[in-house]
UniProtKB/Swiss-Prot annotation:
GO biological process: rRNA pseudouridine synthesis; telomere maintenance via telomerase
Cysteines paired by S-S bonds: none
Compartment(s) where it occurs, according to its Swiss-Prot or TrEMBL record: Nucleus, Nucleolus
GO cellular component: nucleolus; sno(s)RNA-containing ribonucleoprotein complex; telomerase holoenzyme complex
Summary of the function given for this chain in its UniProt record: Required for ribosome biogenesis. Part of a complex which catalyzes pseudouridylation of rRNA. This involves the isomerization of uridine such that the ribose is subsequently attached to C5, instead of the normal N1. Pseudouridine ('psi') residues may serve to stabilize the conformation of rRNAs.
Signal peptide (UniProt feature, chain positions): none
Region (Disordered): 1-28
Name of the featured protein: H/ACA ribonucleoprotein complex subunit 2-like protein
Subunit structure, interactors included: Component of the small nucleolar ribonucleoprotein particle containing H/ACA-type snoRNAs (H/ACA snoRNPs). Component of the telomerase holoenzyme complex.
Similarity comment: Belongs to the eukaryotic ribosomal protein eL8 family.
A GO MF term: RNA binding
Protein backbone atom coordinates (compact mmCIF):
# COMPACT_ATOMS: atom_id res chain seq x y z
CA UNK A 1 0.00 0.00 0.00
CA UNK A 2 1.24 3.43 -0.91
CA UNK A 3 0.53 6.67 0.84
CA UNK A 4 -1.80 9.12 -0.77
CA UNK A 5 -0.10 12.38 -1.71
CA UNK A 6 -0.83 15.40 0.46
CA UNK A 7 -2.98 18.13 -0.99
CA UNK A 8 -1.78 21.65 -1.50
CA UNK A 9 -3.06 24.21 1.00
CA UNK A 10 -4.60 26.22 -1.84
CA UNK A 11 -6.52 23.15 -2.99
CA UNK A 12 -7.79 22.59 0.55
CA UNK A 13 -8.96 26.22 0.80
CA UNK A 14 -10.78 25.93 -2.52
CA UNK A 15 -12.49 22.72 -1.41
CA UNK A 16 -13.40 24.32 1.93
CA UNK A 17 -14.90 27.37 0.18
CA UNK A 18 -16.80 25.11 -2.21
CA UNK A 19 -18.13 23.00 0.64
CA UNK A 20 -19.31 26.20 2.35
CA UNK A 21 -21.69 26.53 -0.56
CA UNK A 22 -24.61 28.82 -0.25
CA UNK A 23 -26.26 30.40 2.77
CA UNK A 24 -28.81 27.61 3.22
CA UNK A 25 -26.08 24.95 3.44
CA UNK A 26 -24.20 26.93 6.08
CA UNK A 27 -27.37 27.44 8.14
CA UNK A 28 -28.17 23.75 7.87
CA UNK A 29 -24.63 22.85 8.90
CA UNK A 30 -24.98 25.03 12.00
CA UNK A 31 -28.33 23.42 12.83
CA UNK A 32 -26.80 19.95 12.52
CA UNK A 33 -23.88 20.92 14.75
CA UNK A 34 -26.27 22.51 17.26
CA UNK A 35 -28.21 19.25 17.56
CA UNK A 36 -25.02 17.34 18.39
CA UNK A 37 -24.08 19.37 21.46
CA UNK A 38 -24.09 17.99 25.00
CA UNK A 39 -27.06 18.53 27.31
CA UNK A 40 -25.09 20.94 29.53
CA UNK A 41 -24.20 23.25 26.61
CA UNK A 42 -26.15 26.28 27.71
CA UNK A 43 -25.98 29.16 26.78
CA UNK A 44 -25.25 28.17 23.19
CA UNK A 45 -24.20 31.01 20.90
CA UNK A 46 -26.44 31.71 17.92
CA UNK A 47 -25.16 31.24 14.38
CA UNK A 48 -24.22 34.90 13.81
CA UNK A 49 -22.63 35.24 17.24
CA UNK A 50 -20.67 32.02 16.69
CA UNK A 51 -19.32 33.35 13.40
CA UNK A 52 -18.35 36.66 15.03
CA UNK A 53 -16.67 34.83 17.93
CA UNK A 54 -14.64 32.66 15.54
CA UNK A 55 -13.47 35.76 13.64
CA UNK A 56 -12.43 37.43 16.89
CA UNK A 57 -10.59 34.29 18.00
CA UNK A 58 -8.70 34.28 14.68
CA UNK A 59 -7.64 37.89 15.23
CA UNK A 60 -6.60 37.13 18.81
CA UNK A 61 -4.61 34.07 17.77
CA UNK A 62 -2.63 36.20 15.31
CA UNK A 63 -1.80 38.51 18.23
CA UNK A 64 -0.98 35.48 20.46
CA UNK A 65 -3.60 36.73 22.89
CA UNK A 66 -5.61 33.58 23.65
CA UNK A 67 -5.34 30.61 25.99
CA UNK A 68 -6.22 27.19 24.58
CA UNK A 69 -7.19 24.06 26.45
CA UNK A 70 -8.98 23.39 29.69
CA UNK A 71 -5.84 23.24 31.79
CA UNK A 72 -4.43 26.56 30.57
CA UNK A 73 -7.78 28.34 30.72
CA UNK A 74 -8.48 27.17 34.25
CA UNK A 75 -4.95 28.04 35.40
CA UNK A 76 -5.08 31.59 34.07
CA UNK A 77 -8.62 32.20 35.35
CA UNK A 78 -7.39 31.29 38.82
CA UNK A 79 -4.45 33.68 38.33
CA UNK A 80 -6.90 36.49 37.59
CA UNK A 81 -6.87 36.92 33.80
CA UNK A 82 -10.04 38.40 32.31
CA UNK A 83 -11.75 37.72 29.01
CA UNK A 84 -14.45 35.62 27.36
CA UNK A 85 -14.40 31.85 27.70
CA UNK A 86 -15.62 29.83 24.72
CA UNK A 87 -16.41 26.18 25.35
CA UNK A 88 -17.05 23.59 22.64
CA UNK A 89 -20.43 21.95 23.12
CA UNK A 90 -19.62 18.67 21.40
CA UNK A 91 -16.81 17.56 23.72
CA UNK A 92 -17.15 14.07 25.15
CA UNK A 93 -17.09 12.91 27.88
CA UNK A 94 -18.87 15.76 29.62
CA UNK A 95 -16.85 15.21 32.79
CA UNK A 96 -13.81 16.68 31.06
CA UNK A 97 -15.13 20.22 31.26
CA UNK A 98 -18.37 20.22 33.28
CA UNK A 99 -16.67 22.14 36.12
CA UNK A 100 -15.57 25.02 33.87
CA UNK A 101 -18.83 27.05 33.87
CA UNK A 102 -18.76 27.09 37.68
CA UNK A 103 -15.15 28.31 37.66
CA UNK A 104 -16.12 31.08 35.22
CA UNK A 105 -19.15 32.11 37.29
CA UNK A 106 -17.07 32.25 40.47
CA UNK A 107 -14.54 34.52 38.75
CA UNK A 108 -17.36 36.57 37.12
CA UNK A 109 -16.06 35.81 33.63
CA UNK A 110 -18.60 35.58 30.78
CA UNK A 111 -18.72 32.28 28.94
CA UNK A 112 -20.73 30.62 26.19
CA UNK A 113 -20.78 27.39 24.25
CA UNK A 114 -20.06 27.07 20.55
CA UNK A 115 -21.23 24.02 18.58
CA UNK A 116 -17.99 22.43 17.34
CA UNK A 117 -14.56 21.86 18.87
CA UNK A 118 -13.03 21.35 15.42
CA UNK A 119 -14.14 24.81 14.29
CA UNK A 120 -12.95 26.34 17.56
CA UNK A 121 -9.53 24.74 17.09
CA UNK A 122 -9.26 26.00 13.52
CA UNK A 123 -10.20 29.51 14.59
CA UNK A 124 -7.56 29.35 17.34
CA UNK A 125 -4.89 28.54 14.76
CA UNK A 126 -4.49 24.88 15.62
CA UNK A 127 -4.81 21.79 13.48
CA UNK A 128 -6.26 19.93 16.47
CA UNK A 129 -9.72 20.37 17.98
CA UNK A 130 -9.82 22.64 21.02
CA UNK A 131 -12.54 22.31 23.63
CA UNK A 132 -11.93 25.58 25.46
CA UNK A 133 -10.50 29.03 24.65
CA UNK A 134 -9.99 32.12 26.80
CA UNK A 135 -10.24 35.20 24.59
CA UNK A 136 -8.38 38.17 26.07
CA UNK A 137 -8.94 41.82 25.07
CA UNK A 138 -6.43 43.71 22.93
CA UNK A 139 -6.32 47.10 21.19
CA UNK A 140 -6.03 45.65 17.68
CA UNK A 141 -9.44 43.94 17.78
CA UNK A 142 -11.09 45.81 20.66
CA UNK A 143 -14.26 46.78 18.76
CA UNK A 144 -15.12 43.22 17.73
CA UNK A 145 -14.19 42.00 21.23
CA UNK A 146 -16.56 44.53 22.81
CA UNK A 147 -19.41 43.46 20.51
CA UNK A 148 -18.82 39.82 21.39
CA UNK A 149 -18.63 40.66 25.09
CA UNK A 150 -21.97 42.46 25.11
CA UNK A 151 -23.65 39.66 23.15
CA UNK A 152 -22.23 36.92 25.39
CA UNK A 153 -23.24 38.74 28.58
CA UNK A 154 -26.81 39.16 27.30
CA UNK A 155 -27.24 35.44 26.61
CA UNK A 156 -29.69 33.79 29.03
CA UNK A 157 -27.89 31.90 31.80
CA UNK A 158 -28.86 28.37 32.78
CA UNK A 159 -30.75 27.89 36.01
Amino acid sequence: MAKTPKKDKTEEKEEHEESGGNKEDRERAYEVLATRVNPIASPLAARKLTKRLYKTVKKASKEKNIRKGIRDVQKFIKKGERGIVLIAGDTTPIEVYCHLPVVCEDAKIPYCYVPAKQDLGEAAGSKRPTCCVLLKPNESYQSSYDECLTDVTTLPRPI
